[in-house]
């Protein structure tokens, strides 16, 4: 299992917010977008902040998760721990120290 750890600088949107360290779990089909890492360790106050971080640090991963308007793609699900973000506060879901964000793309076939 490959894990990438980073220290994140805050941008204008997160400067006044309390940031915490969380883990983002990257599914196998998207690991090539982040150097093969299965997990990313990052600091962000919200799910939106975590997505902004991947936009800066792993743009191809971001483009796989979000569309050109910044919305999460329809076939991608984001969970914080065991709760889907849509069942919480969407992208504004606050993160707590040690939370795990899981990227889960839909699987289809026939």
Predicted features and spans:
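Ubiquitin-like/PB1-type beta-grasp interaction modules and other compact soluble beta-rich domains
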Residues: 2-109
